[in-house]
Amino acid sequence: MELHIKNLCKSFDGSPVLENVSFTAGPGVTCVMAPSGAGKTTLLRILLGLERPDSGNFTGNVRWAAVFQEDRLLEHLDAMGNLRFVLGAALDETAAGALLTELGLGDTAGKPVREFSGGMKRRLALARALLAPSAALALDEPFTGLDEENRARCQALLRRAGEEKPVLLVTHDPADAQALDAAVVKL
């Protein structure tokens, strides 16, 4: 499955944020790179249907799973409770337990998310996206707050996910693209 983005434009209050953005993303990891404030998050919001472009189009009507800059977790639930609440009947609890363990969250049963560190919350948000039944992943700065070891774990999981579906990741860090062996789109 391929996503085709063609001539996307978006302005806010007359100031252009995206100007004629075009690229194709197939299975694998594609990193959209630009400095802070250059429209990376806006691009993801358009693809996710949360914003409307001023002009241009994209094809690939897909079900997305996303990691936003804010983790959007339920603070009073534990890790598995967050996954159950969001994914419902689609959740494979055996796979979820294995993924939580792989992400270093296997020993958090019963611990409310409000007691998690920022990096733990980030890994849980990534687990939620990876477990969701989706055709593509949209990830907004998914490695923020992760130490080197956990960053490498998450990168390995995203490379693996990219073998089956498009993984669109926005970042300003070229090291992310290199570690993910990603195609790069510069805004």
Regions found by a protein language model. Name each.
Residues 48:
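Helix-to-loop junction immediately C-terminal to a conserved catalytic motif
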Residues 77-89:
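Q-loop/switch helix immediately C-terminal to the Walker
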Residues 91-108:
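Conserved ABC ATPase "signature" region
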Residues 112-116:
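Conserved ABC ATPase signature
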Residues 126:
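Hydrophobic anchor residue at the start of the ABC signature
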Residues 137-141:
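Catalytic Walker B motif of ABC-type/P-loop ATPase nucleotide-binding domains
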Residues 148-150:
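Helix N-cap at the start of a conserved alpha-helix in ABC-type nucleotide-binding domains
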